[in-house]
Amino acid sequence: MNIQEEIKKRRTFAIISHPDAGKTTITEQLLYFGGEIREAGTVKGKKTGTFAKSDWMDIEKQRGISVTSSVMQFDYDGKRVNILDTPGHEDFSEDTYRTLMAVDAAVMVVDSAKGIEAQTKKLFEVVKHRGIPVFTFMNKLDRDGREPLDLLQELEEILGIASYPMNWPIGMGKAFEGLYDLYNQRLELYKGDERFASLEDGDKLFGSNPFYEQVKDDIELLNEAGNEFSEEAILAGELTPVFFGSALTNFGVQTFLETFLKFAPEPHGHKKTDGEIVDPYDKDFSGFVFKIQANMDPRHRDRIAFVRIVSGEFERGMSVNLPRTGKGAKLSNVTQFMAESRENVTNAVAGDIIGVYDTGTYQVGDTLTVGKNKFEFEPLPTFTPEIFMKVSAKNVMKQKSFHKGIEQLVQEGAVQLYKNYQTSEYMLGAVGQLQFEVFKHRMEGEYNAEVVMSPMGKKTVRWIKPEDLDERMSSSRNILAKDRFDQPVFLFENDFALRWFADKYPDVELEEKM
């Protein structure tokens, strides 16, 4: 195998959107074109019992939302495609943000009837911060939606990114006729047996259709006042190519996929803690753990560490360094994924995502290297939780299951764990309420450990250096605790309590995470 050629083939991207914009549906259609599933359109089939391929966890099937990030791989048109399907629900932003550290591009799915929504904006900010390319898919043209020009304007005004339409809708909803493909200079037809027609045939096909007349006017306006197409600006994350289509009816998706693969970047390098970039074509293997998932197969109570390969080639059985612990590990049981199905892998290269069976060796953010290389990649973002709950085992006889469940789910990063300094009570912190619900559901379903949870409300969290800590700093306005790394942390009742503390101890430095 020529490793350089293999790396060049890789296209690794995440799909981001607000809940219900159609992200899971478009994922299914892409897998359908990749030959990974026989039948697309099984998303949210609650009555029929068919569920989206990427929504594999029990609670996701019940609710019809993605709460973990799935990893799926397929080959198409000479490229090896790695899709990371991220949770659309806002409470799972932590897992999503970390996943966005492991990709080279993002596909942003927008509901054309609703435009840019809150969660899309949040996720876009992370992608923009990383400077990776964003490709936009305006979805649900099979329903009535907003004017295409308004949608482009929203991209520029709300997200602050220039846009270039690759195609343009001819009508919408019941009046939807197809797409005027500006990039390929052809018509893509929604109805009839023929899929494509030449632009010259447009007048003959659509006659005096008012929507087609409108399209011609819009395109004239875009040619005069729109942005110029620039591959350089796309790769720099400064210009987003915009595709219109309908994932549900599988219209415009294949055109999108083929054009996307043409312009999406090859695997990029990754920055070490000293600021140096590790090149994907370096011969030495390196990678980082961006996600840990327990119980992907409940029958085996397994844990998988998801690793983005940054450089070189993985070979089954290879030994790696784990600089965080100073120890080594052997990568013998490694898989690649199609949501919940998996297959053992013997080789993988930079750009690929592999799953390493984990018995508790790895943590999110770990760097893996080989040979004399002992460097670490820049740390992944960690997030300050906003709401807290006390948690304890309902049945004292189930303490062992309770502790195992908490340990594994916390290592996944699903919730954050704190321990009261004085009472040793367990407290959980989360970005949003849904995280607690998922935690409770999984503790009971996967670990057979019922839990008692009592709300503590919102807290303002700040870390303190161990050498600055004096237990007398604890008061009725704060809770002194330890995080899961045994670092001291204060949970303040509110901003007033934080300011009061800062005034009382002006020399003490308090640290805030993202």
From Swiss-Prot:
Keywords: Cytoplasm, GTP-binding, Nucleotide-binding, Protein biosynthesis. GTP binds at residues 17-24, 85-89, 139-142. GO terms for cellular component: cytosol. GO terms for molecular function: GTP binding; GTPase activity; translation release factor activity, codon nonspecific; translation release factor activity, codon specific. Its main location: cytoplasm. Pfam families: EF-G_D2, GTP_EFTU, RF3_C. Residues 8-268 form the tr-type G domain. GO terms for biological process: regulation of translational termination. It comes from the Bacteria. Disulfide bonds: none annotated. It is found in: Cytoplasm. Increases the formation of ribosomal termination complexes and stimulates activities of RF-1 and RF-2. It binds guanine nucleotides and has strong preference for UGA stop codons. It may interact directly with the ribosome. The stimulation of RF-1 and RF-2 is significantly reduced by GTP and GDP, but not by GMP. Belongs to the TRAFAC class translation factor GTPase superfamily. Classic translation factor GTPase family. PrfC subfamily. This is Peptide chain release factor 3. The lineage of its organism: Bacteria, Bacillati, Bacillota, Bacilli, Lactobacillales.
